[in-house]
Regions:
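Bacterial Sec-pathway N-terminal export signals of envelope proteins
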Residues: 18-71, 219, 225-264, 318, ...
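Short, charged, amphipathic alpha-helical segments
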Residues: 117, 180-189, 330, 396-404
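Sec-dependent N-terminal signal peptides
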Residues: 4-13
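Periplasmic alpha-helical coiled-coil/stalk elements that build and connect Gram-negative outer-membrane
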Residues: 53, 133-248, 360, 364, ...
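Acidic, low-complexity, intrinsically disordered peripheral segments
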Residues: 6, 18-21, 76, 211, ...
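Small/polar, glycine/serine/threonine/aspartate-rich low-complexity segments that form flexible
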Residues: 21-23, 69-101, 228-239, 271, ...
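Amphipathic alpha-helical coiled-coil segments
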Residues: 43-58, 130, 134-154, 171, ...
Length: 439
């Protein structure tokens, strides 16, 4: 009976695991899943914990160190005179408790604590930066899948139209209203449209596979994205001003905070290097005792009787260090200048990125508005030409050209629409740090 029970439990567990994984994913579900399971992010979170341990260690360096030592020795004298009252075997033990405390080191340890805290913060910012990169990759893939998915529908509609034209052309050929060459051209066009549809479906599968890889899903898992119902309206939403996005991004983005911390670390590194010229004051103290056999005194009596203690202070004043301190200070100043240049470069790169997002969003939104009108015009023109073709008033070339114009208009509408959606998403993300859900 145990095997059937085990099989039922395993099946129930598998069913539950499968039920927890959706087959149709929203943008937010993709982001949440990736942020939880991405290896780079999880590795970064471990690095944060490691940096926190370093910070605790640097803070503990302010405290005195304490150590306990004990030494035990056994002795043996095999040729001792038999008339002696002393034992041939002897034992001695030493016990010591020692403490060391650096009272002053030019504030080096304080500076090290500050640097450790900054490194800790930078480790967290690295996780945030990687998180942002992953979210940008996800939204790009998600929008690309939406675009190709709708493109597949367009190609399917075009193929359906071509097949209808083949059927009508076949009827016209039977009654002598269409030549064999024109019918062959209609059939060739239908075959081309079918090829384009298959190609679009293949591209869609490739992007879905990339998304599965990014989400760390099994390649055989069912996966599709939730198609928003209001994407047309969202593509026509107001575009946030580039200056407003830049101001928010410069204050919020982790790469800018990283660059600012690098500058602060550079300044503190100069202070640390200068401590090489500072004197160091340290205190040392200890207490100890010892015991031995052969003295006629018990171990318990020897412990307090032999107790001894010491207390000392060490003052270390650097006089000449073969220019090592000066070299360290100069190199720290150069590193600070490099950090300032990197911050300037990061600022400029971020500004150019946001400006590029804004230009792409604005341009493609205008293209989308124009493309919507072009699709309506091309659709009306094609339907009119189709009717005229059936009446024998238009030839096959004019019909094919009209269909090509319609397809190009539809593709232009889709491309501009989803490109606008992508850059609108990125602008909002750089402004407030959140991806807006597609409705």
């Amino acid at each position: 009976m145990r095997k059937p029970i085990l099989a039922v439990v395993m099946a129930a567990t598998l069913h539950t695991a499968m039920a927890d994984t959706p087959t149709v994913w929203t943008l937010q579900q993709c982001i949440d899943h990736a942020l939880q399971h991405n290896i780079t992010l999880n590795t970064g979170r471990l690095s944060v914990l490691s940096a926190q341990e370093d910070t605790r260690e640097s803070q503990a360096a302010l405290l005195p160190s304490l150590s306990l030592s004990t030494t035990h020795q056994l002795g043996y004298q095999p040729f001792m005179d038999n008339g002696s009252s002393a034992d041939k075997a002897s034992y001695s033990g030493d016990y010591g408790l020692n403490a060391n405390w650096t009272v002053w080191d030019g504030k080096r340890r304080r500076y090290n604590i500050t640097q450790s805290e900054r490194i800790d913060r930078q480790a967290q910012l690295t996780v945030e930066e990687n998180s942002n990169n992953i979210q940008e990759q996800i939204v790009q893939l998600f929008v690309q899948i939406l675009y190709i998915n709708e493109s597949v529908n367009v190609h399917q509609e075009i193929l359906d139209i071509s097949r209808q034209n083949v059927l009508r052309g076949t009827e016209m050929y039977r009654v002598g209203k269409l030549s064999k060459a024109d019918l062959s051209q209609l059939e060739a066009q239908a075959a081309t449209d079918e090829y384009n549809l298959v190609n679009a479906k293949g591209t869609l599968d490739e992007y879905k596979l990339q998304m599965k890889e990014l989400l760390r899903l099994d390649y055989a898992a069912d996966f599709d994205v939730a198609v928003p119902s209001a994407s047309d309206r969202q593509a026509l939403a107001d575009i946030p001003p580039a200056d407003r996005v830049m101001t928010a991004a410069l204050a919020m983005r982790p790469e800018m905070q990283q660059a600012a911390i690098d500058i602060e670390r550079g300044k503190t590194d100069i202070d640390i290097a200068r401590t090489g010229k500072m004197p160091t004051v340290a205190l040392q103290g200890g207490i100890g005792t010892n015991t031995m056999t052969g003295t006629g005194t018990s171990w318990g009596s020897q412990m307090p009787d032999n107790m001894r203690g010491s207390l000392g202070v060490t003052l270390s004043v650097p006089l000449s260090d073969n220019r090592s301190t000066k070299t360290a200070v100069n190199k720290a100043k150069l590193a600070l200048q490099q950090a300032q240049l990197k911050e300037e470069d990061a600022r400029r790169s971020l500004q150019l990125t946001i400006q590029g997002f804004w230009i792409n969003a604005t341009t493609n939104q205008q293209r989308y508005k124009a493309a919507k009108a072009s699709v309506v015009s091309a659709q009306d023109s094609y339907e009119l030409l189709g009717e005229q073709f059936r009446l024998g008033l238009k030839n096959i070339v004019e019909l094919t050209n009209a269909k090509t114009t319609l397809l190009n208009a539809q593709q232009s509408r889709l491309e501009s629409k989803y490109t606008t959606l992508l850059y609108l998403q990125l602008l909002h993300f750089y402004e407030n740090g959140n991806m807006e859900s597609f409705n």
